[in-house]
Structure formats: structure tokens, C-alpha cells
Amino acid sequence: MEIMYRTARLAATVSALVAMSGLAAPAVEPTILNNLVTELLDLETPQTQAHRQYNFANPRAGWIFVSSAAAVRGAQSVKVILHTADGDVELAAHRDGRMAVHEAMRHLPAGEHTLSVHCEGGAALHGLVVRAIPEIVYPGLGYWTRQAMSRQSPYDWAFLKRIGIAENINVILERNFDASLDAVQWRQQGGKILTREGTHVMIKLRKESGQPFTADWAYEFLSGRPGLKRADRDGIMVSEFDGYGSQKDEYPALTEATQRLFSNPQFKGKVFNPYTVVLYRDEGGMAFVRELIKAGSKIVEERYLSEQPTEAEATALLSGWGIANLMKQYQKKMPDIQKHMIWNLGYMSAPPESLNTNPAVNYKVFMDMQLNCIANNPALAGLYGVMWYHSAYADEETLRWSAKLFRHYCIEGRRDMLGSDPYILPHIENPDFADGASGWNLSPATTGSMAVKHAAGYGRRQARYIGQSGAIENQGDYFLWTKRHADRPNTFSQPIKALEPGRLYSLKVITADYQELLSEKSTRAAHQLGIQIDNAVPAPRRSFQHVFGSDKLWLTYHFFVFRTKSDTATLTISDWVSDDHVYWPSEWGIQFNIEKWKKPGKTGGPVGRELMFSFIELQPYLED
């Protein structure tokens, strides 16, 4: 992916460098681009000399990004070599027929470093950029169990390469083995692999052993973890350690075990990165992480934030306790702790757990706002790393968007927002029926077959991350109820506004069976419905249904993608499967339990079934 070189520099004519061939160019003053990225070198004049060296100063032990641009023909070539204490590393080899831009990431110690560029056969180097960038972590490779909410699952390494994740991260958090990952190649090109561990496993094994939690026991447990023990892995990330007092008796033993662990040459270069939750509240916990930081490990602070009702409230959350003020609390305990911290944002966006809790808000914009705050707020200056948690709860559109956000903020060093869509979705009104039937045109099949109702706690059952991280309590408890009739459907509709002709949009709907909710006896089966959108063309290969369970209830998550032909349209949803509906999942090869009544022009399910409709979200869909 081509980095944004300055146009004037790319267009410059080839000219000879003033310095003699092979003379190293001195390191230049670094330029801070945002809180995450510092530019260490940007070639101003194309190199036509056969050999040239460039010095740069890495401001801290951490990741650097090197991008080189060259156009070569025939036998010409351009090579970029990094000189390290362990030997020379070829970062790029430009040859005829290869891409014009090569990129590489390497983890380097702080201090002076040198690149050598060799131009052969009259070739020229037209661009060379070196930047200090954050650690960018992808969690978690090999987490197969719940990646069912997409036609693209499983999210194996081959898929992640296709959607742009692989080229925009430098650390993989491994949950389970993935045969499509060439771990040797990944590490040879500079990437790292950490394995995921859980404190619940540590607690379970300790209880089974019947032994007290001592430094000896903790050391034996930790030293046996694959990420520390295996030579082809770079460490562990352990979930989780909190400041609520639940682990206060264990922190002294963990601190001593950590000291012993990293004084052992066997674990040189390894890391033990703990997931943390407001750990600044616990002095013993802070002593534990200070020991880890001293050994070169980082802490991974969890912050999973839900959408806010307005953009102003979202901004206040991020600049307040959601991100910036939380960091300030840590800094009171340890100044500059952000330089040893990976900020772990949540991008759960689909069942069984979702931070996309408000169908009136564009979740991709909220994701953009979070990284924008991290890139710009002074409290986060020099932050060591970032990650989104975690892929098993994210749909493939969100994964693709996260790659673009990483690129924008963590590699290009941008301060502006990546997207231009509004925070509040302008397309439909009252998508959660919180205002009754306002904005909707209800057409009941018969008297009393359709109404807006309420069920306490139903929003939580829809996988909304409610009651934590700024979420609105009781959001999603209202729904539209229909009772299926034998002779005609119940339908509800409203105009769709502010569409861009030719653009892709997604429509999400969550359904459940009302009587199953009341009886707490539920059957795992997809609910069938009819969706009609005029002036639109369906995109079936991007659409899917996902049946998920939540607290004794089976629900259906409907995800429908379409391309609009006009700036307005009409959305009609029915509890029948109509002849001309555009949502026909059985033709798309999705495997789920379709009810036997599903036929064109028929009810699509048993007469008398009481369906619950909620979370009617219509928003722009990321096309590439």
C-alpha cells in the first residue's frame, strides 16, 4: 500500500547528490506527526548514486516503519539494507516487475541506526521514509469458536492478508494454531507472535494442585507457557489483572515470580504483557507492572467503550474517563506510563457481544473518533501501542475498517479523521422504537396484531454491551411486536433519506420470538422475514444471517447489504416472506436451520408466531 509521499518530492527530477558516494547522511531532527508516529527520515532528493547511507535515531526501544519507492527497469535494482547488531537485514529489493513501493517494520533498540541503499544499473531511489510507529497488535489469530457472524469466517491468516490486516500490524496475538500462517516468514520479516493466556487457567490449575499461590508456583506456571518457552514465539499476553482488589493477595507472588523470570537468560527478549483494568487503584498491582516494565514488557489497558447518544457526549467520554482522564490516573502513579502501555480498544460489533449498541449511530465513526483521540490528546503523547479487542466478536467490515484506521493513524501519522460520514445516522428515524412507533408507518394484518412493547433487560439479550464503559442502561428494551396472521402480513415502513446513489449500505435487524422470551424455552432456528427496499440492488454475497443464543433465548441477527440507485428509498419490513422481497438467504448458501414453512408468497413461519423486531440500523457499508 503506497504511503503518502509529498508530491513535490516524488515529482523531483533525478539529480546527483552533493555528498560523495557512500558518505552517510546525518540523522535529521525528528518530526512528531501525532502521539503515535514520529518521522525520523524523509528523503528530499532522489538518490542516483550507487551507494548511500542514511542515519536515523530511534527515540525509544520500539517499532520503526521503512518505506522505499523506486522505479526500475531491466537489470536495474535498488536494495535497502538495515544494519543491526545481529547483522545486516535486507528490508527491500526493488527489481523489474516488482511493486514501486516496499514497506517493512522492525523492532529496534533506542539510538542511532543506519540504512544502506544500493542502486545498480543506473537505478534511482525516489523515496525513503523512516518513522517510529506504535506496536500494532491483532487479537486473536485462531479464535475460531464464535466467528460465525460472517460469510467470510473463519478469520484465518490468509483472509487477514486479503483484507489488509497483515500489512498494517506488527504483532499477532495467537489464540490457537492457524495452518495458514507461515510463522517463520512472519518473524523473519520482523513481526512478532505472542500467545494468549488467561488468569482463569492459572487459578484453575493452582486449585487443582492444592498448593498455595506462591512465587515458586507462579514462576513454574509462567515459565511453562508456550509463548515464553518456545523459541519461535516472543512472549505472552495474559488476561486479566484488575485494580478492584480481587487479586491483591496474588500480586506480591507475581512480582517476585516476574523478577525471577526475567533474570533467567532463557527468557531474554521475551515479554509478559498483562491485560489490565484500572490497575492504578491497587498499589500491589502497580508494583507488579513496574517490575514488568523494568524488564521491557508493556501493560495492556482494556477500554471497551459503547456508542453515546450524541457526538458531543461521545467526545466528552473520550476526553474524559473513557480514555484521557483514565490515562491521567495512571500517570499519577507512574509518570510517562503511556510510553509502556498498549491501549486496548474494543471493536466488538456483532453478536455475541457488541459495542455497537445504538442503531442511530455510525459505529465506524465512533471507532474513528477513539483512535483520533489517542492520536491527538496530550495525555496519550508517546503511547507505546494500540490494539482492537477482539476479532471473534467483530464482523468482517469492522476488521477491514480497523486496518484502514491503523494505517491512517499508526503508520501515516495523521491527526485528521479518516472518514467523513456523520456520527448520527441520518437515514431513518427511531430505529430502536424507543419513541414508540414514531417515524414508522405500521400496517397490521388485523386488529391487535402489531404494537410497540417493552421487556426489561431485552437490550442485553441482543448482545449489546450495556451498563459498562458508558453504555446506556436499558437501551434496546423496546421492540416492535407482531403476531403472524394466516391471510396477510404485518408490515412496517418508513422513507430512507440522505442516501448517496451508487453507494453500498447495510441494514441490520435483530429478531426474537416473544413467547420464547416469556417462557424461557427457545428453539435454535433462524427467523424469516421480508425486507423490501425500492431503488436498490441487493448485494447477497455480503449479506448473512446469524443465529445466536443469549440467556435462554435464541435470536437472529440479519445483516443485509444493498446498493442504492437514488438518494431516497422506502424500507418495508414484514413478518411474511413475500414474493418480491430482496432478502433471500437460502439462495446464498448460508447454513442454518431454515423453517419448513419458508416459501415465496407465504408466511415464512408458523401462523400465530409472535416476533420481536429491534435494532433497525441502516448505515454506509465499507466497500473495499
Regions found by a protein language model. Give the residues of each.
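Extended, low-complexity, turn-rich repeat/linker tracts enriched in Gly/Pro/Ser/Thr and Asp/Glu
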Residues: 70-79, 121-124, 485-486, 499-501, ...
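Glycan-processing catalytic domains of CAZymes
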Residues: 58, 66-70, 74-76, 86, ...
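Short beta-strand-plus-loop segments that form exposed binding edges in beta-rich domains
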Residues: 116-123, 573-582, 596-607
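Short, surface-exposed beta-strand/strand-loop-strand elements in extracellular ectodomains
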Residues: 76-88, 524-536
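Extra-cytoplasmic beta-strand recognition segments
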Residues: 60-70, 433, 490-523, 558-562, ...
